[in-house]
Amino acid sequence: MPQRIIIALVETDAYLGARDKNPFNFQHFNVREICLYKDGMPFPRPMARLDFKNGKVAESYHNFMLALKGSYSRFVPNVTIDEFKEGFTLFVYDMSPDQLGSVNHESLLNRYSNVRLEMKFAEKTPTSITLLAYSERYHLLKIFEDRRVNIDL
């Protein structure tokens, strides 16, 4: 089970390398609802309801800031809520048991779980889009003197 999941949406042309488009322009494409499910249950809370046109995105922005910072990190994303709405839109889910991004609880995480993402859009997307999913996992990597590599999954 990953410690953190980050979801981004980008225009497919930009993702495929169109020279006139920025592949790091992560847009919201008027997502109306987004929910991550862990083993069939909404995680960490019920579905987020968004309204980008009217600026109602505070909950997702708050989750973005908390999940990327955590209480054990000195990293604070330098993204304002206006930037979040205009091209820095990342949906971040902290999957750690304490919801603080802590690596100290690896033993409490289920090794195997089913994760599902549901998204609904307020209107038809203007172009084809690509969903990028990044998961962060903490594993133990051992390299022995005979150059054998062992990864503890």
Q: Whereabouts are the PLM-identified features?
A:
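Flexible assembly/topogenesis modules
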Residues: 1-153
